Amino acid sequence: MSNNNFKQEDLELLRKIGKKAEASQRDLANDLNLSLGKLNYCMKSLMRKGFVKINRLKENPSKIKYILTQEGIALRTKLTIDFMKKKMAEYDELKRELETKENK
């Protein structure tokens, strides 16, 4: 599973779905500061790739619940780990730069 095609907004969307499965696309778009059109595009892509599925709520069939599939959970985990590794590498680089400047 290559994550070269995934962006930070995909990780944020996967995390939000994991926390707020019953949120509407409008709620998710507002939470992530994305346009509704962009959120819809990202959501369709994640569903097409099998990372997210939808279920209609029994008590209100017009409402949708977004669910992470096992693949979606695995992707969220991998993207989170990759994000943390990137941030730790950035931190280490900044720390080296500061130490170099202090030693001059």
Listing of model-derived features with the role each one plays in the protein:
Residues 75-104:
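Amphipathic alpha-helical dimerization/coiled-coil segments
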Residues 15, 26, 44:
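Residues within the helices of the helix-turn-helix
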Residues 30, 47-48:
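Alpha-helical residues within the helix-turn-helix
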